[in-house]
Amino acid sequence: MKKFVALMLALVMVLALCACGGDNEEAKTDTETKDYSSMTLDELKAEITTVTEGKLTVATSPDFAPYEFYVADDDGEYKIVGFDMALAQLIADKLGLELEVVPMDFDGTINELGSKKVDLGMAGYSPDPDREGLMNFSSVYYTGGQSFVCTKSTESKFTDLASANNADYTIGAQIGSIQADLAKENTPDANIVEMAKVTDIVADMLAGKMDGAFIETAVAETYAKNYPDLVVKFAVPYDKEGSVVGVNKDNDALLAAVNLIIEEAKADGTIDQYVADANELASGEHFILSGGKIIAEE
């Protein structure tokens, strides 16, 4: 009887060890991560899920020409264009998805990505480390710079960037942007006014309500071409230049796919063409400020 009991106990222990081993193997399998960076685009397409099946949902802030802005078509209907939007369409096409663009204020695009309500954010993002907890960064697809902008009527106030750091001056920047950080860094004594849209900042400068503003260089140059009273006065030092796509942090497969598409589009000149096309459209003779929107008639 004792031998039987001992045999049964030994059997139970063996089975328990096997079960533990099985659990460990299962746990190991569950915790293994796939190497998406080594996959082809076709392989990645099979791995990608999006917030809405069959769609690529992209948040943007369409007040940032030539990155993203509104144009009016022949029927007077507005649509969002720009080289960010051209790249978004390319990504959607390459992945076999329908593109859905959701316009909102700039800081809203970051919040939507952080809450994982969209797949991508494309709003002229710089790879700011403070945003890493809210999104993954793609590789850089466009390298620009930062500028201090004023008007011809205020230009004489500014001999260099340091001269803008004056408590008597009102300096603008977009809410939640790199430019807002640059304003606080370079002009902490000034009255810094953060606004939701770059269009509103430009309108206030033109109306004499603001002495100057920090604006991304390509965007500043686009406005200056269309509004001769604007002056791109100084380059602003910034060591993290370059624009990236913000990717939902739950979607490593999508991040890898976006990087592959960007790499190809940079290599074959596609992005350069997108930038040229967007600059041409945003510099049209019908480019106007209207209701907080940048509108260029096609």
Q: Where do the PLM segments sit?
A:
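Acidic, polar ligand-binding/catalytic clefts
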Residues: 89, 98-163
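Short helix-initiation/N-cap motifs at beta->coil->alpha
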Residues: 83-85, 100-111, 156, 193-207, ...
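A ligand-binding cleft/hinge motif common to bilobed small-molecule-binding domains
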Residues: 107-108, 125-134, 181-185, 206-207, ...
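Extracytoplasmic small-molecule ligand-binding "clamshell" domains
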Residues: 28-125
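C-terminal motif of bacterial Sec signal peptides marking the signal peptidase cleavage site
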Residues: 15-19
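Extended ligand-binding regions for polar small-molecule ligands
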Residues: 23, 30-39, 85-94, 152-154, ...
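Periplasmic-binding protein-like
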Residues: 62, 143-152, 217, 221-262, ...
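Ligand-binding clefts/hinges and TM-proximal coupling segments of bilobed small-molecule sensing domains
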Residues: 27, 32-38, 43-49, 178-195, ...
